[in-house]
């Protein structure tokens, strides 16, 4: 069956749960960009209420930290009502996807983009695909990417790998992302910590 599956509640990882990071990078607000990944109503709707609320709250804390520290904020969002050509192979795994209506497309209220934020149309798993994210980062002298959003083992992880592949240091915020299950979530953060990123918590970003 295509589409987002039914999601059962699970606890987000805490600092005590995180996998061991091979890299030893530190976030520098002068070098970083925050990526708010696919935090649209359509994608958040399947999440259990408590899980959704916690992820949105943590992402909003990071969003505020970015504003307070001069860190550019980038948003990915699918356009909705994609044509067959635009949808491509996505439809074989995820069906037709969201409609172009605000009920599907809007970023949730606590994370509403602000003037000056970078708004990127999302076409495939990676935030870098067919967007100017890399060019914007290079033009602004930024070589670190902090990632929050959904879904951890799909677009979030692929965007993390793509950042790494372009020599951008990714920081994956383990309690500001969500997934289809605890197992998918842990798979994503374990892969990231051992292969391409620093896995951290919201408190480590904002404190």
Swiss-Prot record:
It comes from the Bacteria. SUPFAM superfamilies: Isochorismatase-like hydrolases. Its EC number is 3.3.2.1. One of its GO terms (molecular function) is isochorismatase activity. It catalyses: isochorismate + H2O = (2S,3S)-2,3-dihydroxy-2,3-dihydrobenzoate + pyruvate. It is an enzyme of class 3 (hydrolase). Keywords: Antibiotic biosynthesis, Hydrolase, Virulence. The keyword Protein biosynthesis does not apply. GO terms for biological process: phenazine biosynthetic process. Pathway: Antibiotic biosynthesis; phenazine biosynthesis. Involved in the biosynthesis of the antibiotic phenazine, a nitrogen-containing heterocyclic molecule having important roles in virulence, competition and biological control. This isochorismatase may remove pyruvate from chorismate during the formation of the phenazine ring structure and/or stabilize the phenazine biosynthetic complex. Belongs to the isochorismatase family. This is Probable isochorismatase. The gene is phzA.
């Amino acid at each position: 069956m295509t589409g987002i599956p039914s999601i059962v509640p699970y606890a987000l990882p805490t600092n005590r749960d995180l996998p061991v990071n091979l890299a030893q990078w530190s976030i520098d607000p002068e070098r970083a960009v925050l990526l708010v990944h696919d935090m649209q109503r359509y994608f958040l709707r399947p999440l259990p209420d408590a899980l959704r609320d916690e992820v949105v709250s943590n992402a909003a804390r990071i969003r505020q930290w970015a504003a307070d520290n001069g860190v550019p904020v980038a948003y990915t969002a699918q356009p909705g009502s994609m044509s067959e050509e635009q949808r491509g192979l996505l439809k074989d795994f995820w069906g037709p996807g969201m409609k172009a209506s605000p009920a599907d497309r809007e970023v949730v209220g606590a994370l509403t983009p602000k003037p000056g934020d970078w708004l990127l149309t999302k076409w495939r798993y990676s935030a870098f695909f067919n967007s100017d994210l890399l060019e914007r980062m290079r033009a602004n002298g930024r070589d670190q990417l902090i990632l929050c959003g959904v879904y951890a083992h799909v677009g979030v992880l692929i965007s993390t790998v793509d950042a790494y592949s372009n020599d951008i240091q990714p920081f994956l915020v383990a309690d500001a992302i969500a997934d289809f299950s605890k197992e998918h979530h842990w798979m994503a953060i374990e892969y990231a910590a051992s292969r391409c990123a620093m896995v951290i918590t919201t408190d480590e970003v904002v404190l």
